[in-house]
Amino acid sequence: MTENLIIHVDMDAFYASVELLDNPELRGQCVIVGGASNRGVVCSASYEARALGVRSAMPIVTARKLCPRGVFLPVRRARYQEISRKVFEIFHQYTPLVEPISLDEAFMDVTSSTRLFGSGEEIAANIRRQIESSLGITASAGIAKNKLVAKIASDLCKPNGLLVVPADQTQEFLDPLPISRLWGVGPASRNKLISLGVKTIRDVRKLTQEMLSANFGRNGEVIYAFARGMDDRPVEPPGAAKSIGREITFDRNVYTLEEAYKWMLFLSERVARRMRKEEATGRTVNIKVKYADFIQVTRSVTLESPTDDPGEIYTHAKKLLQKTLVGSKAVRLLGVTLSQLVTPGQAWQPGLFDDPTASERKRKLNQALDGIWDRFGSGTVEPAALVTDVAKHNLR
C-alpha cells in the first residue's frame, strides 16, 4: 500500500515579496505591507522587518515603533491575486489535488504523481525552482505523510527551504517540538497544557485520551491524534464534494478481526452503492474505528485512480483495518468513507496501469446489482459472507 505523500507549499513573505519584485530598489530594506497610515494591521513584512520584531496582524502603529525607517506600503490585492494564480498554475502541473489555504499557501497530494515526476522531494524542489525562476519570488515546502506534519515542516524550514519528514521518522521529528506547533493548540490550550506539566509534543503523548478529552472536549481527541503524527484529513480541492460514508455502532462489541472484516465488507458495499447513486467516484478510502473504551482512530489511503467499486473499497479498507488494534481490542463502531470525490463534470486522467476492460466489467456488474436492489429492495443480493449477519441484525 502506497504511503500518502503530501506537500505543503508556503510563499515566503508573499505580499512583501511581490512588492520587492515590483520595486527592486527596496531590496534590503524593511518593507511592511498594510497601509501608510497608523490605522490597520500588518499584512506582510519582509524578513528585514521581521528581524526587528514586526509580525503579521500587528498594529501598524506598533510596527512603526519597532521599525521607524521601514517602508510602509498599501495592500494591492489584485496584484497579489495575479501572482497567486501563476503560482497555482505551477502546482497544477504536478497534481489536480491542490487545496488552497490562502493566496500564498496550499496543500498538494502527490501520492500518484511520483511515477511521472519523481520523488516528493524532487517534485517540491522543481515547484520551488519554477516559482523562483518564472516569478522571481521564493517558497518553502514541507513533505510528509500527512497535512499536519507537512505544514509543520514547511514552517520550520522558512524562508526559502525544503524539509522532508520520512514517514517512519514522523514521531522522532515531532517529539521535541513545543506544543504550540500542533494545530488546535492556541494560547488558551497551550496555557492549560503547561499547567498539566506539558511543554513538548513528547509530553502530550504521556497524557491519556480520556485526560485530554476531559480538559479540552472534542479537541482533546484531535490533540491526542496529532501528537502521535496521525492526521487522515485528505487534500480537498475547492468545490469538491467532501465525502460519502457510512458507519455502524454495534449492539454488542466486535472482538475478532474476521468479524470486523465482514462489517467492513458490508459498509464498503453500502458506500459504493451510494457513490454510484451520486454518480461519483472517490480517491481516498478512510476507515474509522471506535474501541469499547471510546478511543477513536482513523486510517486512510489515496488510490491511483478514483473508484466506486465495492471490492476495491473493501480491499483497501481491510488493509487499513490491519493497521489498527482491531482483533486485540473490543470494537463498538466501524466506519468507511470515500473522499476526494470525482464527479462526471470533472476530468480525470486514468492511471498508466489501469485496465479499461476490467473496469468496464466491474461497472456492468455493479449496474446489474443496483438494478436488483432498486427493484427488489436493498440487501436483496449480498456477498455470501454477509448473508447471515445482515439478516441477524436486520441491516439493509
UniProtKB/Swiss-Prot annotation:
Presence of the UniProt keyword Magnesium in the record: yes
GO cellular component: cytosol
Site (Substrate discrimination): Y15
Reaction catalysis annotation: DNA(n) + a 2'-deoxyribonucleoside 5'-triphosphate = DNA(n+1) + diphosphate
Cofactor binding: number and manner: Binds 2 magnesium ions per subunit.
Compartments, as annotated in UniProt: Cytoplasm
Signal sequence segment: none
Binding site for Mg(2+): D10, D104
EC nos: 2.7.7.7
UniProt keywords, alphabetically: Cytoplasm, DNA damage, DNA repair, DNA replication, DNA-binding, DNA-directed DNA polymerase, Magnesium, Metal-binding, Mutator protein, Nucleotidyltransferase, Transferase
Gene3D superfamilies per record: 3.30.70.270, 3.40.1170.60, 5' to 3' exonuclease, C-terminal subdomain, DNA polymerase, Y-family, little finger domain
EC category: transferase
GO biological process, one term: DNA-templated DNA replication
Active site annotation, chain numbering: E105
Cofactor(s) the protein needs: Mg(2+)
Subunit structure: Monomer.
Record's protein name: DNA polymerase IV
Name of the gene this protein is made from: dinB
